[in-house]
Amino acid sequence: MHDHSGGDPAGAAARMATEIVGLLHDVDPTIDRLAVDRFPYPVIDALRSHGLRLSDADAVFLPARAVKLPIELPYLCEAMTRVDGAVARLEQAIAPGRTEAQVWSEYYGDLIATEGQYVCTRLFQSGPRTFPYFQECSERVLQAGDLVCLDTDACGFEGYSVDFSRTFLCGDGPPTATQRTLYGRAREQLEHNAALLRPGIEFRELAGQAWPVPDEHRDSRYYCVGHGLGLAGEFPNIPHAIEGVPYPLPGVVEPGMVICLESYVGSRTAGEGVKLEDQFLITADGVERMSTYGFDDRLGGS
């Protein structure tokens, strides 16, 4: 508002509010409530000065966006195709002696080269930086034997997002026993929870039956069981069930939803962790796994 007001933000806000109120009254002069997605504060103040009651539009938009229309599905599939290619480029670039940033740039560069749009985060870590999770890529130099974690978090095509995660092993050597254990548990969590997904299952039921995270990994587990996806990470964000605490999120998994199931299994003792995640489309009679990128065979993938 300040950047584009010609030096008069209050006046610009007043004019914008007057125009909005006029459009509302053209529909129905009795309208006195407006759901707002995002407005500059001066416009919010100006709208309220007209007597409008403002509310958060997310309550309307997010449930509506959660269920995809058939016309949206080809866009989601095309986005996945472009991101898959970029992940393959990154996996090929993983090698001792390269920095995390150098390897991650191969992922971003390939996405752009195929006219993908952008990556929303820099969640790419190696070695001791894989624990705890949510560390951005850095200038750390990859070493042989490192675990290397990627979360795609990409806007792949025409505004539609792709969100899956893979963990790779750097170098040509075998993994350690601890690395195989962490990977095996992360894969078990992912597949266990994937088997629960179905149209009609309540969020509460999904969380309650989710893979029981062992005590040694509980403090560093991923913050939710899974979440919706579309134009970004979206509703529903499915929290873990906590014994003795009423489950906070009502609702059910519906056909047309895209759900990303999360897994992170880390070890404070070993100082490393494994991040896996897959993206699923809920259909009328089942579930389709949208992310089919392979798992690292050396760590126990297939």
Where are these regions (language model features)?
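Active-site neighborhoods and metal-handling regions in enzymes and metal-associated proteins
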Residues: 1-302
